[in-house]
């Protein structure tokens, strides 16, 4: 078999199972509306949970940062790319979340991969929730450590796996709010199991940070849990992009020595760090609380409006409201019909989700108005969902 034959076979398999992914260029993809080729739809696919990507103050902060620092960092943070703006943001994040240190990364994917790659050795074991993000599971499977997956949100099975004999150390991996199901992890029980076994706990709270909790502190703060490694990302509630790892002083120093994704990547633009500091100020403010309350109201409105036809909904009270339809072709068809009704929703299919669980991943935001949710509900009811 040649490389071209292998590539064509893989593409054919995706085509035959209605799992082929395509990107559609848009003129505006965040906020209340999605705009493309002169048309617009109510946007139920964006992760811009608080609507901050369109916030005038945050946009102005990025512009001011670019005027001061330029549009790029110029290098790795280990060389010349670590600016005063980066340091200020790290200190603000650490203060907000109650950790000694924060380290910035260019993406949540990079942060998760960096942690696993820097920590895991051959004699170690990584025990991960089976529905953890692809960045975590891929890093774990590629690491020299053994990978064991526990049943989704099952602390009892986690404890059983942690109790098995091992020469090395253990790392427990989970998410605060799961990206495809929208449900929350029982973090207190997971932390108890990890601590009982002497394991480190890594929580990726990409979809909780900023969107829930006091001052938007996220899933861990809400559940009174303090993992040794907390990953927060800035492409959701913050409305920007990038990520940070919250940890101890010694762990931060260790990662600065051994986290290759951090050492060998160009640092995020300083202007982006300025914008993120502005976003954090909004998140912590009364305005941020009002936006979280608006988001919570839209979630309640949607779930109440689904009523008796909510059997396909997962048990989610987050901004992520997946409607599981099972078949790939049906998910694509339903997404198409919703767009015809003026609502943009994305069909999520295997391998992103398990076979037989294709779904519409509906995301609600503080930018939505009550009438927008009503329109979505009417479209879903009109198509028998």
Curated annotation (Swiss-Prot):
Pfam families the UniProt entry points to: Aminotran_1_2
Listed InterPro entries: Aminotrans_II_pyridoxalP_BS, Aminotransferase_I/II_large, AON_synthase_class-II, AONS_Archaea/Proteobacteria, AONS_Proteobacteria, PyrdxlP-dep_Trfase, PyrdxlP-dep_Trfase_major, PyrdxlP-dep_Trfase_small
Assigned protein family: Belongs to the class-II pyridoxal-phosphate-dependent aminotransferase family. BioF subfamily.
Cofactors (names): pyridoxal 5'-phosphate
Catalytic activity: 6-carboxyhexanoyl-[ACP] + L-alanine + H(+) = (8S)-8-amino-7-oxononanoate + holo-[ACP] + CO2
Source organism, top-level taxon: Bacteria
Function: Catalyzes the decarboxylative condensation of pimeloyl-[acyl-carrier protein] and L-alanine to produce 8-amino-7-oxononanoate (AON), [acyl-carrier protein], and carbon dioxide.
Keywords: Biotin biosynthesis, Pyridoxal phosphate, Transferase
Gene3D superfamilies: Aspartate Aminotransferase, domain 1, Type I PLP-dependent aspartate aminotransferase-like (Major domain)
Gene: bioF
Pathway per the UniProt entry: Cofactor biosynthesis; biotin biosynthesis
Enzyme class at the top of the EC tree: transferase
EC number: 2.3.1.47
UniProt lineage: Bacteria, Pseudomonadati, Pseudomonadota, Gammaproteobacteria, Enterobacterales
Record: residues binding pyridoxal 5'-phosphate: 108-109, 179, 207, 233
PANTHER family: 8-AMINO-7-OXONONANOATE SYNTHASE, CLASS II AMINOTRANSFERASE/8-AMINO-7-OXONONANOATE SYNTHASE
Residues annotated for substrate binding in this entry: 21, 133, 352
Protein's name in the database: 8-amino-7-oxononanoate synthase
Assembly and oligomerization: Homodimer.
Annotated positions of the N6-(pyridoxal phosphate)lysine modification: 236
């Amino acid at each position: 078999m040649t490389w071209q034959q292998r590539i064509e076979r893989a593409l054919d398999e995706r085509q035959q199972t209605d799992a082929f992914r395509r990107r559609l260029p848009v003129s505006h993809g965040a906020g209340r509306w999605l705009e493309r080729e002169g048309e617009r739809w109510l946007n139920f696919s964006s992760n811009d949970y608080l609507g901050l990507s369109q916030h005038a103050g945050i946009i102005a902060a990025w512009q001011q940062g670019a005027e001061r620092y330029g549009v790029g960092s110029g290098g790795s943070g280990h060389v010349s790319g670590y600016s005063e703006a980066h340091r200020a943001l790290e200190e603000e994040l650490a203060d907000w979340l109650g950790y000694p240190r924060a380290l910035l990364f260019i993406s949540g994917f990079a942060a998760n991969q960096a942690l696993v790659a820097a920590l895991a050795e051959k004699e170690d074991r990584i025990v991960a929730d089976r529905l953890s993000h692809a960045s975590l599971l891929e890093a774990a499977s590629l690491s020299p450590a053994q990978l064991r997956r526990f049943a989704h949100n099952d602390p009892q099975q986690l404890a059983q796996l942690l109790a098995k004999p091992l020469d090395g150390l253990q790392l427990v991996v989970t998410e605060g709010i799961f990206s495809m199901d929208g449900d929350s992890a029982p973090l207190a029980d997971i932390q108890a199991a990890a601590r009982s076994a002497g394991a480190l706990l890594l929580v990726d709270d990409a979809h909780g940070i900023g969107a829930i909790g006091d001052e938007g502190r996220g899933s861990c703060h809400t559940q009174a849990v303090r993992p040794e490694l907390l990953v927060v990302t800035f492409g959701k509630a913050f409305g920007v992009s990038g990520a940070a790892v919250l940890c101890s002083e010694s762990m931060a120093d260790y990662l600065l020595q051994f986290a290759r994704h951090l050492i060998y990547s160009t640092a995020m633009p300083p202007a982006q760090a300025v914008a993120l500091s502005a976003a954090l100020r909004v998140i912590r403010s009364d305005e941020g609380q009002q936006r979280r309350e608006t988001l919570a109201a839209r979630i309640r409105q949607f779930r109440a409006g689904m009523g008796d036809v909510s059997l396909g909904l997962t048990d989610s009270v987050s901004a992520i409201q997946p409607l599981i339809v099972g078949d790939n072709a049906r998910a694509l068809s339903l997404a198409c019909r919703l767009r015809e009704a003026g609502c943009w929703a994305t069909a999520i299919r295997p391998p992103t989700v398990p076979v037989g669980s294709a779904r519409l991943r509906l995301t609600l935001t503080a930018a939505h108005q009550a009438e927008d949710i009503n329109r979505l509900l009417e479209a879903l009811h009109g198509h028998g969902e």
